[in-house]
């Protein structure tokens, strides 16, 4: 969008500035080239890859999600037990990462379940 110097927007913008020159903060149309200086910067867009497995039904998708949450819980418990009985076999950060993954997954699952129950109650209480 280009601002015409004869427009009312231009005059209201420059009304407090005395002088014949344009306002010092007025847009000049300068373009800044952005270059990638680090590997973590945004690069070319890749097309999304289709998943290897797509659930056939909602119930199957929920079952798979709950199974993966359970697997995370089991993995965290196993690492915790290894840490207690053989501390040199596992690093403390591995135990913490597994425990946090399991906690976040369980919290998310509980939030989803609470939302479903709340929605069901609202639907059944409609009159």
UniProtKB/Swiss-Prot annotation:
Domain of life: Bacteria
Signal peptide positions on this chain: none
Protein's UniProt name: Flagellar hook-basal body complex protein FliE
Family: Belongs to the FliE family.
GO MF term list: cytoskeletal motor activity; structural molecule activity
Keyword Endoplasmic reticulum tagged: no
UniProt-listed InterPro entries: FliE
Subcellular location: Bacterial flagellum basal body
Main subcellular location: other
One annotated GO biological process: bacterial-type flagellum assembly
Keywords recorded for this protein, A-Z: Bacterial flagellum
GO cellular component assignments: bacterial-type flagellum basal body
């Amino acid at each position: 969008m280009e601002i015409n110097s004869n427009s009312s927007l231009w005059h209201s913008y420059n009304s407090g500035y005395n002088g014949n020159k344009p306002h010092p903060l007025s847009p000049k149309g300068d373009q800044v080239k952005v270059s990638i200086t680090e590997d973590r910067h945004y690069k070319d867009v890749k097309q999304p890859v289709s998943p290897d497995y797509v659930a056939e039904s909602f119930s199957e998708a929920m079952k798979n999600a709950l199974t993966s949450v359970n697997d995370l819980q089991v993995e965290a418990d196993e690492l915790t037990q290894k840490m207690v009985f053989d501390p040199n076999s596992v690093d403390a950060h591995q135990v913490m990462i597994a425990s946090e993954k399991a906690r976040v997954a369980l919290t998310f699952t509980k939030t989803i379940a609470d939302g479903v129950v709340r929605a069901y109650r609202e639907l059944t209480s409609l009159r």
